[in-house]
């Protein structure tokens, strides 16, 4: 009686399923050392990242949403930028802008990248900014690029947006446009610990 053995191999640059699962458990455990008592929150957020998607975290201030995102960035060792959304934040504050510089005796415009140019971007309190500013994330989240002055600038992979928002009942918040909500794989409600 011959038994055939099936081995699972991964393509170059990819982990085998067993190794992937072990790596995911390791990341979850490491994040869990800092974010204590919020296992479901950690797991749901990491699920979004492992699915190569963006996640929206909703909860009142002080529940550790920002700490969670910073910890994930540290654990997975990626470039990280935080954007604090406020009513006076402008789209160029996120995407970047062309600045006029003197070079070789001439004035030229040079692109100055904004904080969206990172592997993991924390859009903190995203619903405190105006809809116009919120919409500056749309192209980046959907197409992994930014267009400024008719020039396209690709975002380095991997690219994830983890956004936090306060409940709409709180003063000074704006609802996220439907097009913005569609860019997130899911919204995680952050409970009290």
Question: Each PLM stretch: what is its role?
Answer:
Residues 60, 94, 164:
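P-loop (Walker A) phosphate-binding loop of NTP-binding proteins
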Residues 59, 124-125, 136:
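Walker B catalytic acidic pair
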Residues 55, 121, 159:
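Conserved beta-strand position immediately N-terminal to the Walker
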Residues 49-87:
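Walker A/P-loop
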Residues 44-47, 100-122:
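Conserved alpha-helical scaffold flanking the Walker A/P-loop in AAA+ ATPase domains
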Residues 17-63:
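Pre-Walker A (pre-P-loop) alpha-helix and adjacent loop at the N terminus of AAA/AAA+ ATPase modules
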Residues 43, 50-52, 76, 95, ...:
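Short loop/turn elements that form and flank the Walker-type P-loop nucleotide-binding site
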Residues 101-106, 129-133, 141-193:
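Canonical AAA+ ATPase core
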């Amino acid at each position: 009686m011959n038994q055939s053995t099936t081995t699972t191999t991964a393509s170059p640059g990819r982990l085998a399923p067993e190794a992937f699962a072990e790596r995911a458990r390791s990341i979850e455990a490491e994040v869990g050392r800092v974010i204590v008592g919020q296992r479901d929150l950690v797991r749901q957020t990491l699920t979004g990242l492992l699915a190569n998607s963006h996640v929206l975290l909703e909860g009142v201030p002080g529940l550790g949403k920002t700490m969670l995102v910073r910890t994930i960035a540290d654990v997975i060792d990626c470039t990280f930028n935080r954007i604090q959304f406020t009513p006076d934040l402008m789209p160029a504050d996120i995407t970047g802008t062309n600045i006029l510089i003197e070079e070789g005796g001439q004035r030229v415009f040079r692109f100055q990248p904004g904080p969206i140019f990172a592997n993991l971007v924390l859009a903190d309190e995203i619903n405190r900014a105006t809809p116009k500013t919120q919409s500056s994330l749309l192209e980046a989240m959907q197409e992994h690029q930014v267009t400024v002055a008719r020039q396209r600038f690709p975002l380095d992979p991997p690219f994830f947006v983890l956004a936090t928002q306060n409940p709409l009942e709180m003063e000074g918040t704006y609802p996220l446009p439907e097009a913005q909500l569609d860019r997130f794989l899911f919204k995680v409600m952050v409970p009290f610990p």
